[in-house]
């Protein structure tokens, strides 16, 4: 017997999944956070996320698109934020968006996995990551808040070609997306 809450299904065996349909990323509750080592010290920051998800049957044909505004990078330091958004790093004036587009969603014995393309500064990079699905409280209208978290590691050379003394090669990313039903979506995640 499948246990259901509005928007989430928990079939026998316990692997939760979104119900089929269109979902919108709530930008007020969603972000990508990052950590990178610079001269042996961690630098942490965030980027707000928007986008959409289309869950289909079979699940492998589902699609997701996440978008982060490069100019909205936030580390808690206005000077560092300007540096990261500037031409030496994210170059937000020339490349205002960083995006992820899924190509395959699948369940493995270790959990949900997604394979897709991360676009940074007009260059695409293949990316695979694991996903976790959670109920995250209740929305003001009483419907459940559904959270998807994912994590991956990217190469700092995807962000900058400049040699920066002490900049670590690994950038650890974690995305936290709060999803809500998208009743106005007509064509799926590719429209976001």
Q: Where are the predicted features?
A:
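Low-complexity, acidic/polar, glycine-enriched regions of mature
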Residues: 1-192
